[in-house]
């Protein structure tokens, strides 16, 4: 009976001595040390987002977990077992930013538009862990080497959002997101906005009338892109003839087959041009 009592007391003492100490701050991709108390052999288990390992350890010594086992950020559990088990949870945080995923929409925008460009940036460490710790992302919009807009945005739930206007000149707009020494760049093509001050001229031909526009610009002076459609309309009393013509090298031209005194006009989108009156020959 005395022997059984000694064994029971020893088991209680071992139960009281067994303890697991985990790091208060761990970083992805770095080795960690887990402390234990007591003496003798035990079995160690580590359970994490993508890891599950088991090996024998000696109580009272530090258990070193190699960096390869902590590359994925998240919640981990360390378990040490003898005749019973003790466990402790700890969190592995992402490492420093190593890359930015940067999405910008759309890829083509008219000039002079408010809040027409949208961007979203997400930071990842070298192991692909999304970084949730709040940080400041710097956005810059530049065209022809000059900065148009600079904005600093605090991440929320790992995401930094951008809404920005387009510039006034057609051409490539570079949109850059930066976080510390990491950056990503995207290019948005700025094109002319709607035509402005549409004007036409014309002359009689044996088959009707030949009309063309003056060089077409938007209100900021940018040439409208080739392919922009201009609709020419010729009226002679109740008779109406229409021709759609694409802009080529800033000008749209059309041959309209119509007779008599004509009133010719042009329109592109919501923009109306001047009216041209051509007398019958």
Language model features by range: what are they?
Residues 2-10:
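Bacterial N-terminal signal peptides
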Residues 11-281:
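The feature marks long extracellular or luminal low-complexity segments
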């Amino acid at each position: 009976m005395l022997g059984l009592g000694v064994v029971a007391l020893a088991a209680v003492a071992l139960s009281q001595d067994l303890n697991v100490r985990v790091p208060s701050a761990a970083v992805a991709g770095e080795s960690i040390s887990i402390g234990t108390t007591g003496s003798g052999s035990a079995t160690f288990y580590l359970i994490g987002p993508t890891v599950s390992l088991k090996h024998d350890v000696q109580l009272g010594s530090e258990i070193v977990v190699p960096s390869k086992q902590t590359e994925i950020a998240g919640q981990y559990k360390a378990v040490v077992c003898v005749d019973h088990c003790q466990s402790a949870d700890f969190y592995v945080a992402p490492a420093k930013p190593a890359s930015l995923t940067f999405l910008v929409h759309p890829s083509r925008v008219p000039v002079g538009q408010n809040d027409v460009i949208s961007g979203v940036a997400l930071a990842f460490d070298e192991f692909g862990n999304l970084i949730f710790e709040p940080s400041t992302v710097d956005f810059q919009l530049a065209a022809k080497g000059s900065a148009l807009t600079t904005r600093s945005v605090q991440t929320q739930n790992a995401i930094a959002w951008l809404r920005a206007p387009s510039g006034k000149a057609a051409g490539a707009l570079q949109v850059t997101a930066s976080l510390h020494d990491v950056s990503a760049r995207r290019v948005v093509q700025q094109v002319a906005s709607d035509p402005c001050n549409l004007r036409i001229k014309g002359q009689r031909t044996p088959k009707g009338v030949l009309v063309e526009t003056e060089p077409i610009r938007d209100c900021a002076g940018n040439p409208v892109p080739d392919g922009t459609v201009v609709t020419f309309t010729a009226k002679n009393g109740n008779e109406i003839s229409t021709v759609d013509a694409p802009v080529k090298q800033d000008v749209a031209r059309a041959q309209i087959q119509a007779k008599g005194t004509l009133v010719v006009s042009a329109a592109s989108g919501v923009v109306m041009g001047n009216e041209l009156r051509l007398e019958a020959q």
